């Protein structure tokens, strides 16, 4: 992962994260981890599963509303918010040494293979 001292112009906080034309899932995982790091965002650093539980539910409901409305632009945004919540909760457990995003993906794939 390449990092830069310049943050994106519109950032409310200065991130040491490279601004790019487009990002992928690995960037998303790295960014969430960075935000929780000592050099990241003070708010993100202190969050727990319990403190952001409501956010997870709210983002899920907002994704459902976008699906119900057939609004693909809003749906893409809200699915990103749900994914951010998954990554955030996973990063808390990665820090604790319990599991990481690859473990979550492994368990999900195994479940799908078993069910199908």
Tell where the protein language model's regions lie, with residue ranges:
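Flexible "arm" and connector segments at domain edges
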Residues: 1-79, 84-115
């Amino acid at each position: 992962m390449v990092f830069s001292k310049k943050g994106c112009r519109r950032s409310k906080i200065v991130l040491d994260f490279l601004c790019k034309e487009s990002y992928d899932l690995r960037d998303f995982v790295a960014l969430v981890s960075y935000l929780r790091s000592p050099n990241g965002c003070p708010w993100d650093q202190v969050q727990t599963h319990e403190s952001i539980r409501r956010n997870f539910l709210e983002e899920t409901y907002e994704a459902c509303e976008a699906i119900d409305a057939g609004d693909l632009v809003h749906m893409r945004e809200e699915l990103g918010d749900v994914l951010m919540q998954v990554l955030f909760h996973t990063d808390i457990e990665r820090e604790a040494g319990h599991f990481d995003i690859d473990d979550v993906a492994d368990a999900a794939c195994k479940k799908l293979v078993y069910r199908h």
